[in-house]
């Protein structure tokens, strides 16, 4: 596998990591390992999904994280993916507490967002999330493999650069994840730390310190990320780092915007506008700074990061050697190009994300209202100031400076005068009394200059719970013009304020004045009745209902009704008032499918009882996830509520959710022991109900969630089925053993559960224990008499499984009990094999001490313990086995041997050890590769030098193991070694072979390097070793580079003297080689550099003909569209075949279409007289026949003549079938005659696409072919009647052949007898022009041009002054005439002849 495939198809040896008994894996590591076993346990992804599913879940706060974690675990086990293998390896051993912590952090984040009621913040958050959703997933996946990348590039020049990128990314990920889970106060404090995370991340875009920008620029500017060959591992790893770093850079930008937006919104909500302004400036500057770095500024993006990265990606994608890699690599490159292009477009398309405008604060304050102080917030001698801000729903805008303070003297509610805004924007007005929190007091329209600060006081008065004071103030303010509909924070009006405060006196007055607006929602969809219900103001609710307020109106986000809110709060009186409405829907569902009764579970037993007593209540209503109110009561550990629900005879205690989980399942998984006991005691509860699809009972869940107290209680219950088998035959005992629940296992044994229970794959509890990380369970089961020789369906014993899974302690315990270590499974595996492959030296020593000969045991793949130890890279085990006389030259079915394994890994010490102990240096695998070749291919120069200097083998020995690679001669090891070094791009090895050892002639190094696209090696050989770039053995380096599509190598060779038109093989040149493999970029370059497009190779083909015969559609199109002057589209080979013939032979319909649509002569016949259409018919190529039939009746493309007119008269289509070389010259006078008269007509739009010159020449051709001699004057009329008849008949037959091309043309439309008569008459009378008219008029059924236009055209074209005698035409002339007729037909095809042209 190449380096790029290793990076982009990243795989890890999960079993090796799972074997580490003493290492506790993190949640992320375990999730990753288990996903490799198809568990699909993606913790954070599942967490996000669950939060989306239960965002309105009516459960108490302390339960929410636990409940979400439980649901996440259910999703995990309910996926049906948990099999016995995962259970044994600890994948099922979910870190529940860690999941709970994750979920609680996620809910903290959600709570913060719900408290942030800012559209501007939402817009920035949406922008960030939209971009980050496409960036973050792959970026974090890339981050996981950086350890291996760093290890593989250790001691290289890019290592420090990649390390910086990796370190920055990990710091960013860790800190960002950590702060997201903080509660509000801690979150704000963390963000505002001096020189904390926000400061550090802002600095990361500067080219200093440990930032991110500098290392990315180094990779780009130094070209580290552009691979020179398929094996350029460093370049591919640098590319990986560049992509990861760039995605991190984008993530940092949007993370900063999110956090500063949050801070701005946070302080705006608190009314601390000065701090808000500070963070507003931060948002603006961050966006503009990062935008400049990412996409450039000032009209140039040449130095911008995203453009530079895109250029790198395009350069990598253009590498021809990518075609040898898996398609995933190309797909990845395309995805990254698309991703960064979209980000660039999105960022560049936004001028800014904050408003650039700040209104001037020209407020002039005067007190004109007769409202004496003290009144509301207006207190005598207090100072008041004002500030203004442009109103914007979607952009943050800056708040102006505060006005000079005005002292309150006797009056309240001043008038503010300000100039009309020049930007024609609405303006928000804020006021602040001394050091108190500022308040929004209103909005000024674009053309308003006076503003009375009175509406906020009305809103505040409405919110005053003191009935009399609030009412008195409202009355006074309304009398002075206050607007009761004025909106304030979140779009709430005085109606909302009164509903919340419960001031019935104020509310009554407002209701009377707002009858049409009682259902008006705020920005979150809360109406006045929502506000009243949420606060338990039953009187207000009643008042609103009396005045027809809607009782079923829903909020925007959660779609909750007033009844949901009242029920959640437990407001019984409010509930009663709502239920008095005849319109109430007691079972109305919110966004997640929860009814008010679900919400009532939080409100307590009294409100639940009220629901139960209400007719029509659906007591078993299910949410979208299938949860009933009874489920929620159990989840909340609230038995009084559950008991209240049980009073209803309709209650279904075994109701199941979408995973078939009953309330009992939830009680068990959440560890609610007392609730569980009460449920078990209910006669109607099904204690053995199972979930789907894994068929788990409550007992399974109790064990899985490690609720030992619950499990032990369940084991006491007689009706609990202790042996219930779930999917895969897994019983509770199997789960308890695999999860290491020793107390549970002991109790199960005590009550007599069968220890030999088997899964569907015949695993016993002891098998599972042997594979698990709990050796104490192994000991316990053995002590209880478990069968130590039991076999699985595959024939594995507990000991074999323990060794295969690397469980050394379990293996030693079993060996100590004298189990059969010779037992073999169906794969031929024995415990010694497992011990060897896992490096368990003590186990291997114990087994071999018992039976020394077992060291030679082979499994079904012919692997011995020694070979397995070598393949899994356990040097000490290898040395031990060699010391025990293991066959050092052992090979498995693939030919893998110990020496080869360590050569691949570059372990020189083990190479020396094995060779010194008799390893055969010539031993090769099934591909013929020995240890030396592997050292070469992997670039292990130390092993190569050791082998060469110590003369461990003969360099010149013929190697028959690779004879198929060298079929025509005996090739030595030296040949293959040098070839391999070049092919795999190991330049240090090449320098050693060619430079140090002077092996210039072995493997034609320069040709081989060019053949495999190894540019660095090509440069080295040309520049340092001065090899000839035109060496040919056979073919030059340029030929081979062109054939294989290595454009960079082709360019280098051409620039350094390679002859472009030099022969390769069979008379082909480099361009032929490139065309044959469809390398269009190489073809374009070679043409640009002078490749001869008219040269024919040994097969008689020009490059254009080669493109067609090679089915290289893109190249053929390139020649036709861009190089028409250098090719002949109608060229024929020695067999008379045209390009169209070849396209038909290869059944290439697309090529046929390209040629026909670009004017190829479809009537050309090959050496046996066949046209392309006839060949297609003979071969029954129906689609091509159908196409050619259709196209043959259409007018030849008009742009053909435009090409002919561009300086290439020799390419005129008429010249393809006429003998006269001077025909164009002979008629120049005709073409130039009467220019002014014809110019207007011929240049009219109707004739812009007509081949006029071709038609003019056609008439001449007809005449010349009729006479063979040229023009004869009218007086010479020596033709006999027989000759005229014969000529007329031949013309008519040719015309009939022309008509036969149109298979669907009704023959009755053309009377050939009449055509013959008219042609004969025209010939006999010498009226030559009428022949053309006769033939064209016969095609009138398909004509399109206006009659007048056709008549004018014909009169101009046929104005010739001669007649001609008729003779018998030879075949060649007849064929040419037929072609002429074909073109003539096309020139008439779109013509509608007027009656005046219907002759005789």
Curated annotation (Swiss-Prot):
Residues 1-20 form the signal peptide. It is found in: Secreted; Target cell membrane. The keyword Membrane applies. Processed by furin-like proteases at both the N- and C-termini. One of its GO terms (biological process) is exocytosis. Residues 1198-1400 form a propeptide. One of its GO terms (cellular component) is membrane. Expressed in venom gland, cephalothorax, and abdomen tissues from both males and females. Residues 238-257 are annotated as: Helix H8 is the probable transmembrane region of the tetrameric pore inserted in the target cell membrane. ANK repeats lie at residues 490-520, 524-553, 558-588, 592-621, 625-655, 659-689, 694-726, 728-757, 761-790, 794-823, 827-856, 861-890, 894-923, 927-957, 969-1001, 1002-1031, 1033-1062, 1066-1095, 1099-1129, 1135-1164, 1168-1197. It comes from the Eukaryota. Disulfide bonds: none annotated. Residues 17-20, 1194-1197 are annotated as: Furin-like endopeptidase recognition region. Its main location: secreted. The keyword Lipid metabolism does not apply. GO terms for molecular function: toxin activity. Keywords: ANK repeat, Exocytosis, Membrane, Neurotoxin, Presynaptic neurotoxin, Repeat, Secreted, Signal, Target cell membrane, Target membrane, Toxin. Presynaptic neurotoxin that causes massive release of neurotransmitters from vertebrate (but not invertebrate) nerve terminals and endocrine cells via a complex mechanism involving activation of receptor(s) and toxin insertion into the plasma membrane with subsequent pore formation. Binds to neurexin-1-alpha (NRXN1) in a calcium dependent manner, adhesion G protein-coupled receptor L1 (ADGRL1, also termed latrophilin-1 and calcium-independent receptor of latrotoxin (CIRL)), and receptor-type tyrosine-protein phosphatase S (PTPRS), also termed PTP sigma. The H8 helix is predicted to insert into membranes and form pores by assembling into tetramers. The helix is contained within a helical bundle domain that undergoes significant conformational changes during pore formation to allow exposure of the H8 transmembrane helix and transition of the toxin from a soluble monomer to a transmembrane tetramer. Belongs to the cationic peptide 01 (latrotoxin) family. 03 (alpha-latrotoxin) subfamily. Homotetramer in membranes. Is the main neurotoxin responsible for the human envenomation syndrome known as latrodectism that results from bites by Latrodectus species. This is Alpha-latrotoxin-Sg1a. It comes from Steatoda grossa.
